[in-house]
Amino acid sequence: MSDPRLSLVAAARKFYQLGWMLGTAGNLSAKVDDHSFWITASGKSKGKLTEQDFVRVELTGKVRELAHRDNRPSAETSIHQVIYCLFPQAQACYHVHSVEANLVSRFARGDKLSLPPLEMLKGLGIWVENPQVFMPVFANYLDVPKIAAEIESRFSTFPPEIPALLISYHGVTVWGESLETTENYLEIVEYIFRYLVAAYQVKPC
């Protein structure tokens, strides 16, 4: 597999400009092979990333390579590890902190968020009429490995309907079989979030 870092840099700049990765928030990763992945280093502005702002991590969590000696893995690295282990076909995993992702956390009921039956759900693989689809929602903890452990536990028993999950009042994570697919998934999910927020503001007829 070719080095994905330049593609991740371009995606990060785009998401930064959209307001999804401000203040160094969020992290993007892509597999290098079946055993490791590049992930954005902690504390780096996503609007100014270079190829040097990454850490190569094994699926076991061991750091294999530092693009720069001062780099350290993102705080959410454990979430990416779990996604790649649970879904071996995934080649990329994107985690962003948009305003809408935080606002829709208010609409969650228990451990899931009901999604509206929008046409855009087809882009997430939902091809049924009047679909009833739920996005898994997880509690937010300062101890990120605890979040990762809960994701692993739930998804091992109840696989998600769509390749996305929401961490309450934190952000959304998506994954896909290519970098392009993962970016498309993120755009679709954020579109749905914007719809939910707008619909909440519209008075019923």
From Swiss-Prot:
Belongs to the aldolase class II family. MtnB subfamily. InterPro entries: Aldolase_II/adducin_N, Aldolase_II/adducin_N_sf, MethylthioRu-1-P_deHdtase_MtnB. Binds 1 zinc ion per subunit. HAMAP family: Salvage_MtnB. Zn(2+) binds at H95, H97. It comes from Microcystis aeruginosa (strain NIES-843 / IAM M-2473). It catalyses: 5-(methylsulfanyl)-D-ribulose 1-phosphate = 5-methylsulfanyl-2,3-dioxopentyl phosphate + H2O. Pfam families: Aldolase_II. Catalyzes the dehydration of methylthioribulose-1-phosphate (MTRu-1-P) into 2,3-diketo-5-methylthiopentyl-1-phosphate (DK-MTP-1-P). The keyword Zinc applies. Gene3D superfamilies: Class II aldolase/adducin N-terminal domain. The gene is mtnB. SUPFAM superfamilies: AraD/HMP-PK domain-like (SSF53639). Its EC number is 4.2.1.109. Its cofactor is Zn(2+). This is Methylthioribulose-1-phosphate dehydratase. GO terms for cellular component: cytoplasm. Keywords: Amino-acid biosynthesis, Lyase, Metal-binding, Methionine biosynthesis, Zinc. It comes from the Bacteria. SMART domains: Aldolase_II. Pathway: Amino-acid biosynthesis; L-methionine biosynthesis via salvage pathway; L-methionine from S-methyl-5-thio-alpha-D-ribose 1-phosphate: step 2/6. It is an enzyme of class 4 (lyase). One of its GO terms (molecular function) is methylthioribulose 1-phosphate dehydratase activity.
